[in-house]
Regions:
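Anion-binding and metal-coordination hotspots
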Residues: 1-181
């Protein structure tokens, strides 16, 4: 990617993690040079060790929304909860109490069906878990561990660096989980 000062190109990577809700351990990682997250959901799920059980449900933010991700997760027997767009903040009471309405028709678009699914009580509860599962892990890696950029060049070396960062996070987390309170 060309930088803004016309001084050459910057390499940018897109790092992904799959985090277990109850343990908040990183279960799988992936790294790509894709400009957005859409093509990274399925490779990250596929990176999950076969000895671990696959998740039954997966909550993803709107950067992952695509028909191919929905179909791919369903084909892996994973129920997707993927935001279809930005969620409005500070909604009025009228909007919050608005009725759910009728379910979309069978021939409705994937976006309409997913938007309805996320408006159900089960959908809201499941999507809400994403905020307290994945986001704190990323925040700890960036703020507490101070990892904000890759120091090695090339995607293979950067991927190794990302795995080491995630292993370091998991060691810190395991220490918290097994330490007596």
């Amino acid at each position: 990617m060309k930088n803004s000062q016309n001084q050459g190109f910057d390499q940018h990577y897109n790092a992904q993690v799959l985090v277990g809700h109850e343990s908040r351990l990183i279960l799988a990682t992936s790294l790509s040079n894709h400009p957005n997250d859409q093509r990274d959901a399925l490779p990250t799920v596929d990176a999950l060790d076969p000895q671990l059980s696959r998740p039954q449900r997966l909550a993803l933010d709107n950067g992952y929304f695509s028909q191919s991700n929905i179909d791919g997760l369903l084909s892996r027997n994973i129920d997707p909860y993927i935001a279809t767009g930005r969620q409005p903040h500070h909604q009025s009471w009228a909007a919050l109490l608005e009725s759910l309405g009728e379910p979309p028709a069978d021939d409705a678009s994937a976006q309409v069906k997913m938007a309805y699914k996320l408006k159900t009580e089960a959908g809201k509860a499941m999507y809400r878990l994403r905020k307290c599962t994945v986001e704190p892990v990323i925040g700890i890696i960036k703020e507490v561990m101070g990892f904000r950029q890759f120091y090695l060049r090339g995607i293979e070396q950067a991927e190794g660096e990302w795995v080491l960062v995630c292993l370091a996070y998991n060691l810190k987390r395991l220490n918290v989980l097994i330490s007596p309170s």
